[in-house]
Amino acid sequence: MRHPLVMGNWKLNGSKHMVNDLTAALRNELSSVVGCDVAIAPPVTYLELAKHHLGGSRIALGAQNVDTHLSGAYTGEVSAEMLKDIGAKYIIIGHSERRTYHKESDEFIAEKFAVLKEAELIPVLCIGESEAENEAGQTEAVCARQIDAVLNSLGAKAFENTVIAYEPIWAIGTGKSATPAQAQAVHKFIRDHIAKHDAAIAEQVIIQYGGSVNAANAAELFTQPDIDGALVGGASLKADAFAVIVKAAAEAKQS
């Protein structure tokens, strides 16, 4: 049985004061929650501080990006080994903001995926379509293309102990969200697409939903059979809102 994962992506937000307060509040809010894995991905400059405050808790540490190189003359980059050394476990790659603002290709993201697997870290592979692609009926084709970049280079086995986050671009930070039925249909397509290569791998892969997940819509989303948690943006910056989402995932998957 798949174990749900709710992960907070802090994006370009944070300060030492915020890390101190938010991690303390999260520890308090989530101390009694079982049945759902939890992770947060602060900016890389605050990973060490967050790790210190999360010590002894069930909240895992994540990161928002990784470079394809392990070392060398690559100014400003952070390697998989550095993230592993500092204690990060879940690493976000392929986020639409990276694809859009940094022009990251499917092939480049597949390289990042490979580097993370080699380092025994867990990739959180973000995929999803734009509003125009959605309106043109291309959602499945876009998701398949983004997954195939990894499947074709690394094979289905690479998705063992891996997370996929379906994030429709039109729903990220917009207040819009796919309906539970819409999201479930895409999640099922993703799982079925991987199952064409390896059914057992497809069955165990965690598929999160992302895109304006909040306290109001979380519970209904998580009742869907192929939605295994969430990658949460803005709501992860408030302990009470994030905790509601985590608790909704834990309750939905236990019932």
Swiss-Prot record:
Organism this protein belongs to: Sodalis glossinidius (strain morsitans)
Active site per the UniProt annotation: H95, E167
CDD domains, per database record: TIM
Binding, substrate: N9, W10, K11, G173, S212, G233, G234
Assembly and interaction partners: Homodimer.
Function: Involved in the gluconeogenesis. Catalyzes stereospecifically the conversion of dihydroxyacetone phosphate (DHAP) to D-glyceraldehyde-3-phosphate (G3P).
A single Gene Ontology CC term: cytosol
Catalysed reaction, written as an equation: D-glyceraldehyde 3-phosphate = dihydroxyacetone phosphate
Protein location: Cytoplasm
Key words, A-Z: Cytoplasm, Gluconeogenesis, Glycolysis, Isomerase
GO molecular function, one term: triose-phosphate isomerase activity
GO BP of this protein: gluconeogenesis; glyceraldehyde-3-phosphate biosynthetic process; glycerol catabolic process; glycolytic process
Chief location bin: cytoplasm
Underlying gene: tpiA
Protein name: Triosephosphate isomerase
Keyword Isomerase: yes
